[in-house]
From Swiss-Prot:
It comes from the Eukaryota. Gene3D superfamilies: 1.10.287.70, Potassium Channel Kv1.1, Chain A, Voltage-gated potassium channels. Chain C. Residues 358-378 dip into the membrane without crossing it. Residues 1-183, 245-249, 311-324, 407-494 are cytoplasmic. A motif (Selectivity filter) lies at residues 370-375. It is found in: Cell membrane. It comes from Homo sapiens. Pfam families: BTB_2, Ion_trans. This is Voltage-gated potassium channel regulatory subunit KCNF1.
Length: 494
């Protein structure tokens, strides 16, 4: 102990037995001073703070391998780290677990825990979920950046056919890559609308004509327009298929299955009509053709390829399966109960419209969904009361899952916008680093610190003001592991 009676650290290089569990450890993290005790830190001897207890025995080399600076006069260790995250990390010594405060980036907090050598197993489960979500976002950003770099890069070792495939794939799948690609995307979008309008107009009796057998068929002009649209869709699908990097994954993806369903009925109908005319079975073939024509409505789903809003809505519905399942179950129970009550209460009326409970299902469905066609309605007082209650229950049942579905839609839509912005920002940073050489960034990384020359032997203990080190932090997260390689690729693609 010193003259004031306080417990303190021994001088660096000494082998005093005072470096024990009852000494004080004074740390200054980002300007925030904290006094810790050895008996508290020794609970987890593998952590960085616990290593400070006996670090003075190894001299200044050991001290500066653990901290950024050390003031021998104040016996104070300095760390250029986040003080808010540090306050959360030291909770492990008091409570045996770590909780991450709101407003701290989960990835940055994970890096702080790695710096202080606190295992992630001490992080509470609620905080681990935030960390996992942020990791997934960074992986998605890295994937998007990698895709953009792959589109920009041209490998000289690739053959001409492979380079042609990549150009066609980029031309069809990346409308923002060039002005002609954007024009083709707009043209495809307009043709989808035209084909859908033609399909609807073909059912108008005034626009139909009589064939040789006296049957009403679509006007030849509408058929020609539809044939042209189908030809474009077929060409587009084949080009996508031949230029796709993974043809099996391409063929099994949802949007490409929709493309097949949009064009397949046309060719099947054409084939059946031709074969039916030759086999004198035109009546049966026409029935098959009419059944296949209904599949043409699948082409409207092709709009989802050109609409991020429709894709977001699809994702929101997929994430809301639980809420939608609860809605259907609630409606099913209500339909069964109110249809049975309605049938029972209406049996006293001589002109009842409720002939059976299964027939009453229809009335319960249109009542609970607030449609109310009026083809079946109650005539007794109890039946009308039952109808009013079923109506109110239907309104409540339909309104309950709306809020979670909207939340899922807004959350996913905002997340996609953030990921797109982050990917573009990452590319801008990589381009800036490549133009500046990537080695002269302000505030060096950990690799910059590792390349610093070691302290000369026999040098006097530096003070807090005399020892200057690069200010650094681990808050920068490289999204791609081979950052220098990607910077080089980006520079070569200019």
């Amino acid at each position: 102990m010193d003259g004031s009676g306080e417990r303190s650290l021994p001088e660096p290089g000494s082998q005093s037995s005072a470096a024990s569990d009852d000494i004080e450890i004074v740390v200054n993290v980002g300007g925030v001073r904290q006094v810790l005790y050895g008996d508290l830190l020794s609970q987890y001897p593998e952590t960085r703070l616990a290593e400070l207890i006996n670090c003075l025995a190894g001299g200044y080399d050991t001290i500066f391998s653990l901290c950024d600076d050390y003031d021998p006069g104040k016996r104070e260790f300095y760390f250029d780290r986040d003080p808010d995250a540090f306050k959360c990390v030291i909770e492990v010594y008091y409570f045996g677990e770590v909780h991450m405060k709101k407003g701290i980036c989960p990835i940055c907090f994970k890096n702080e825990m790695d710096f202080w050598k606190v295992d992630l197993k001490f992080l509470d489960d609620c905080c681990k979920s935030h960390l996992s979500e942020k990791r997934e976002e960074l992986e998605e950003i890295a994937r998007r950046v990698q895709l953009i770099l792959d589109d920009l890069g041209v490998d000289a070792a690739e053959g001409r056919w492979r380079r042609c495939q990549k150009c066609v794939w980029k031309f069809l799948e990346k409308p923002e890559s060039s002005c002609p690609a954007r024009v083709v995307a707009v043209l495809s979008f307009l043709l989808i609308l035209v084909s859908s309008v033609v399909m609807c107009m073909g059912t108008i009796p005034e626009l139909q004509v009589l064939d040789a057998e006296g049957n009403r068929v679509e006007h030849p002009t509408l058929e020609n327009v539809e044939t042209a649209c189908i030809g474009w869709f077929t060409l587009e699908y084949l080009l996508r298929l031949f230029s796709s990097p993974n043809k099996l994954h391409f063929a099994l993806s949802f949007m490409n299955i929709v493309d097949v369903l949009a064009i397949l009925p046309f060719y099947v109908s054409l084939t059946l009509t031709h074969l039916g005319a030759r086999m004198m079975e035109l009546t049966n073939v026409q029935q098959a053709v009419q059944a296949l024509r209904i599949m043409r409505i699948a082409r409207i789903f092709k709009l989802a390829r050109h609409s991020s809003g429709l894709q977001t809505l699809t994702y929101a519905l997929k994430r809301s399966f639980k809420e939608l399942g609860l809605l259907l179950m609630y409606l099913a129970v209500g339909i069964f109960v109110f249809s049975a009550l309605g049938y029972t209460m209406e049996q006293s009326h001589p002109e009842t419209l409720f002939k059976s409970i299964p027939q009453s299902f229809w009335w319960a469905i249109i009542t609970m969904t607030t449609v109310g066609y009026g083809d079946i309605y109650p005539k007794t007082t109890l039946g009308k009361l039952n109808a009013a209650i079923s109506f109110l229950c239907g309104v409540i049942a339909i309104a309950l899952p709306i809020h979670p579905i909207i939340n899922n839609f807004v959350r996913y839509y905002n997340k996609q916008r953030v990921l797109e912005t982050a990917a573009k920002h990452e590319l801008e940073l990589m381009e800036l680093n490549s133009s500046s050489g990537g080695e002269g960034k302000t505030g060096g990384s950990r690799s910059d610190l590792d390349n610093l020359p070691p302290e000369p032997a026999g040098k006097e203990a530096p003070s807090c003001s005399s020892r200057l080190k690069l200010s650094h932090s681990d808050t920068f997260i490289p999204l791609l592991t081979e950052e220098k390689h990607h910077r080089t690729r980006l520079q070569s693609c200019k």
